[in-house]
Amino acid sequence: MGDGGAERDRGPKRREEPGGRSGRHGEHRGAEDLRADTGSASPREIAGTSASSPAGSRESGGDSDGQQALGETDHCRRILVRDAKGTIREIVLPKGLDLDRPKRTRTSFTAEQLYRLEMEFQRCQYVVGRERTELARQLNLSETQVKVWFQNRRTKQKKDQSRDLEKRASSSASEAFATSNVLRLLEQGRLLSVPRAPSLLALTPGLPGLPASHRGTSLVDPRNSSPRLNPMPSASASSPLPPPLPAICFSSAPLLDLPAGYKLGSSAFEPYSRLEQQKVGSPGQSDKKADI
């Protein structure tokens, strides 16, 4: 019994020792328990705990960048291109885009093949089935070539039709615009036009500023002293006479400078008539001289 009481007395003392062996045993025991727990945990949980830490996240980010860089080099292609300004740029293209692949060769048709294809297109724009097979056999072409030619020909016809419609629409619009401009100009000219004054020579037999005797003798034949007036149109007789022009338009100053032999009432051709009269009277005088 004494031993049992001593053991009971020793128990509390061991618990009270802060830095004794019991504390160190507890730490080792906790570490062993942690190891056991991690050993029993699944690999996914371990990866999740490591990724949750900042160091683990950095390590995982570095690995992903390396994988991306490796994938970029494997699946991408870098090309150096010089632009118009002389600057060199780097373009990253996928390797699936084969730039070195030769272009597809265009099918060249002979004149006879084109003629037959055009004739068939004018007859029917869609050739299918046996007709296409027979046409390809006759022209020594494949059915694919015949099919593609008809597709391209239909596309070309649609483009031509749309272009013609645009031209017609533009021409009709321009014609309508020109017609409207002409009509507008004619309307403006009709509204702005002023009625012309009647001709003075057609309305009056002579100039209104001159005397009445001079009006009638202004147009006289030098060989015939009888006055000859211009014929008056019938329409001018009924129309009213215009107001007389001012006297400054017909000044009588030149008439004052005429010699004294010229009278205002006489004709301007009176000297010529006097000469004719003298010629007519000259044979009688010569006869008188002969008698003397």
From Swiss-Prot:
Where can this protein be found?
Answer: Nucleus
Which sequence positions fall in the DNA-binding region? Answer: 102-161
Coarse class of the primary localization is: nucleus
Q: Which InterPro entries match?
A: EMX-VAX-Noto_Homeobox_TFs (IPR050877), HD (IPR001356), HD_metazoa (IPR020479), Homeobox_CS (IPR017970), Homeodomain-like_sf (IPR009057), HTH_motif (IPR000047)
Q: Where is the composition biased (Basic and acidic residues)?
A: 1-36
PROSITE patterns, A to Z:
HOMEOBOX_1, HOMEOBOX_2
| CDD domains registered for this protein in UniProt | homeodomain
Q: What name is this protein filed under? A: Ventral anterior homeobox 2
Organism of this sequence: Mus musculus (Mouse)
